[in-house]
Amino acid sequence: MKLLFLNTLYAPHIGGGAELMVQAMVEGLQGRGHAVQVLSTGPDAGVHGELHNGVPVLRAGLRNLYWPFAGQRPGPLRRLAWHALDRYNRGMRDVLAQVLAQNRPDLVVCHNLAGWSIAAWDAIRDAGMPIVQVLHDQYLTCPRGMRFHKGKHCQQQCGSCALLRRSHAQASARVDTVVGVSRYQLSALVDAGYFAHSQRYVIYNCAPFIPWQEAPAEVTPRRPLRFGFIGALTPNKGVEWLIEQFQKQALDASLLIAGRGEADYVNTLKSLADPQHVHFVGYRNSCGFFAEIDVAVVPSIGTESFGLVALEACAHHLPVIVSTRGGLVEIVRDGVNGLHCSPERPDSLGEALRRLSEDASLRQRLASHARDSVASMLSVERMLDEYEAVLNRTLLSRGARHGSAIAVSTL
């Protein structure tokens, strides 16, 4: 197949787990003999081509007020104007139309549409090509992509989001195939009225950078026990909640926090923490970090579409405490490879921390099941097999519309 992959960013510009998955998918499918090309946004005007790890990549200058990944945060009015233009960006539709006319792919795989907007769907449909849309976040219902505002998860779509997304559900009906990276992610959009006539699939992300590791022959607890968080230091990740609950328990343990964030917010977190027991270790490689801790904690108070960090922690034979928000519970099963906590019951996080601190046999039992419980998720080849099946079915059923979900994932 001749495939075009559309995403907001592409390596070496990495915004999060979505870019890692796109790169793994593109390079993997190219290795299987498919002709692949990537089109992403970039900071420079015009369309510029390059090879990245042997993959042909086009970077198109973003036709909006600014490129959001330059490291500067504009004021609120400028950000609002950016999102208003991103509701339907005709300039980027024209860029995509030109690329499609020149390259004529068999099929276009859309990932994150921020910058491109849903105008990309019209450009692809006008060119007569089928669309596969992969859902990594809540961009189609929330301009920020996370449905999180003023420190809280948005149970309902707020007025400004509804205004900026008022035609998106209707437009999504013209997408041939939609893939959610978790059952939660797919259901959240379908239940909101999206993709009414699309073929629907769930394909879990893989963990492409996790080497095979044998389980430790014997788990020797450190004293003090080490809990660890790794990820973006942003309000939706629940780090404030974690610090509060950890210190409330007064455990014989330490808490390591790895990651980066805006300086003011990181300083706020540090002001809450007792430096004798809570240690901020900066940006760390996840493999090295997981080797230093006994229990991983993913206490998100905003929804996680998938939760790659939880998958990686399990792959390192660690028990994992996760919040019940989003797709995390599809990776970590309560009492099997970790424990659940709920932001609706704040003390549930502290209870989970205490249980694993005081019950070494529970901790070891969860750790012993951790990697096996996610083994099928880890495989890049599994993910590629499932996407190949979806792409082939989409081409074969071009013009057909199905409203029923088809679970391609082997999990």
Predicted feature residues:
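Glycosyltransferase donor-sugar binding loop
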Residues: 230, 254-267
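Conserved acidic donor-binding segment of nucleotide-sugar-dependent glycosyltransferases
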Residues: 283, 334-335, 339-347, 355-361
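A short, well-ordered alpha-helix in the C-terminal region of glycosyltransferases
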Residues: 348, 355, 362-389
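Short hydrophobic beta-strand element within catalytic cores of glycosyltransferases
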Residues: 319-322
